[in-house]
Amino acid sequence: MSRPELKVSLGIWALSAMVTRFVPAGYQPEAGAESTAEKVRRAVAGLDGIVDDYEFHYPQELSEENLDEVREALDGHGIYCICAGTHLNPRFGKGGLSSPDDATRDAALEEALRGVDFAASLGAHFILWPGVEGYNYPFQTSYAECWARFIDGVEAIARRCEAGGIKLFLEHKNSEPAMKIFMRNIGMCLHVIHTLRARGVTNVQVNMDWQHLLMNGEHLPEYAALLHAEGLLGHQHANSGWGTFDDDNMVGATAFMETLELALELRRADYGSRGERLGLDLYPYTEDQVAAVRRSVEQWRFIDSVAARIDEPALRAAQADKDAVRAYELVYAALGAPAPAPAPGA
């Protein structure tokens, strides 16, 4: 299955100070002193030929105030996505779109809509990861009321995206910063999308953050295939991790086979032919940040090249019989394993 190489977008937060609750100044505090434009210059200088476009949170990383400076630093590279920065504002620690307090909810929605308008002015899509929309304790939340407020808020954002001619990508996660995020799995994400479809809103797709799925035990290639079948496969946030926390490690560092099968399913979906990107959502705590991004892209390109070498007709035949042994023979052949020895008596 041949196709042009996927274009890559990078979340600029990969070059941040790497803050944790244990190290509030960050493992790389020198990056905390950089402006967004300085981070972009560092990325562009070290990732020539590796990264095509960039992604930013609004208004914390990119806004009307620093747009000209950042555009100059981008040196011709594009801005592919603007991400809602609600979770970065302490005012919304107990929820923004879902807040039962009208003033808080109005402020969160107004900030998100400003972000949508900003994204539309750039021709960029908008990502909503509702990490603060949830709860931390039993008995803390009026679930039905807060869910209704949340979905109504997402609808308002989606309709503003539609008016601006851009897509809204929803991204789920099970926990952090809210301990129980409302939209915590693929099923709840699809619930939101299908509720919006019933209201006539059709410009919403899914941003698959790989580690968020792995944290849930959600098999990456299965959900890519499902989302593609429903026309919902919008964007990827590529990374890896151990599976229990949002590690945002380099692509292909763990979950290798899952990532390889995902590469195959993305090829089957012709992902990239409609302008989609492989977005990188990385948090290299202690590693050289630019080197970690470069290594992620190089490892992805290798994994994708293996997927391209898998004998697709033969694999389809094996899958029609649910023949796992034959399927792995084909996968390992693509990885360069020697041909299997003949069975005794064959």
Predicted regions and their residues:
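Short amphipathic alpha-helices and their capping/turn segments at secondary-structure boundaries
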Residues: 1-3, 62-78, 109-122, 151-162, ...
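N-terminal small/glycine-rich loop or linker at the start of catalytic domains
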Residues: 4-26, 85-99, 130-138
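Active-site loop/lid in soluble adenylation, ligation, and acyl-transfer enzymes
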Residues: 36, 49-60, 88-89
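Glycine-rich, proline-tolerant flexible connector loops at the mouths of alpha/beta enzymes
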Residues: 52-70, 137
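Histidine-acidic metal/acid-base catalytic patches
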Residues: 1-45, 183, 187-208, 212-346
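Short coil-to-beta-strand
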Residues: 4-10, 75-88, 120-130, 166, ...
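Active-site acidic/histidine proton-transfer and metal-coordination neighborhood
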Residues: 2-4, 94-205, 215, 329-336
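Conserved beta-strand positions in the central sheet of alpha/beta enzyme cores
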Residues: 52-55, 127-128, 237, 279
